[in-house]
Amino acid sequence: MQIVEQMKDKALAELNLVKDKKTLDDIRVKYLGKKGELTEMMKLIATLPNDEKPKLGQAVNIAKQALQEAINLKLANFEEQELNEKLAQEKIDITLSGVGQNQGSLHPVTKTLNRIEAFFKQNGFAIEFGPEIESDYYNFETLNIPSHHPARAMHDTFYIDETHVLRTHTSGVQIRTMEKQQPPIRIIAPGRVYRCDSDITHTPMFHQVEGLLVDKDVSFADLKGLLHAFLNSFFEKDLKVRFRPSYFPFTEPSAEADIECVMCDGKGCRVCKHTGWLEVLGCGMVHPKVLKAGNIDSEKYQGFAFGMGVERLSMLRYGIDDLRMFFENDLRFLKQF
């Protein structure tokens, strides 16, 4: 038994001097391998008297267990050390400046459309869409625009053929909605529209949002209240709003809504032409002939409609002075939004 204890102490002493995994494995083989010294001691059990066999077997097992635990602990220390060295070599220097990433954003026109749609959806309006190539019937006839009306002139409209045009407004969506749905009706119709015009304030294609509400006992006061609330929400300030009498063939009475200039707070500047007011949208009570074209009883129901140019509202909200910048794909401009 004393020999086993001495062998264990010797092995543990050698383990304390080990500096690498290879030497550690050599010691393991030397004492615990198939021909290791402690393994050979087990073979001596057969030569001992019966009363001595259990004592030697127990002593050898205790020695082997102690040695194995010491080897495992040493091995774990080596592996932890190797891992720490590897992590130190692969460490990322977080003090270095990061690599810049280009981050996309929504186009200002899209942002404006989303803002308009959000307000009207919150107020119970549905969103309806229609074809961009529109028939003469829906683009003009049903909107009380007869064949001799100036809006039909070639300099205003892109004609596809004698009976189809690139729509000049989204008002045709209103008629299509009235044909398939009885009041109450609350819709807005956003989309692209086309007109033969191109300068600093006009482009051949632009975006428009038109709205329609048809129900019983609808008045111009309802229209004014809704649009005033919309303009305050869109520009995020309490604006002065005025409604000027105007003319549109599809509404009667008709008006244009002006807001106090957001650039100069009504004091007068180049943007508002020193009037202190900016025109932002057109509106009015739906003409009885238009209701009739949509199969709505004008004696029973009334309605109001309104329309606004999305690019114009974008220009006013973001302080943009040239409409054409929206369509030039200049990243220096677009990155500002």
Curated annotation (Swiss-Prot):
Cofactor binding summary note: Binds 2 magnesium ions per tetramer.
EC nos: 6.1.1.20
Enzyme class, UniProt record, top EC level: ligase
Keyword Transferase: no
Organism superkingdom: Bacteria
Record-linked HAMAP family: Phe_tRNA_synth_alpha1
Name of protein: Phenylalanine--tRNA ligase alpha subunit
UniProt organism field: Francisella tularensis subsp. tularensis (strain SCHU S4 / Schu 4)
Source lineage: Bacteria, Pseudomonadati, Pseudomonadota, Gammaproteobacteria, Thiotrichales
Name of encoding gene: pheS
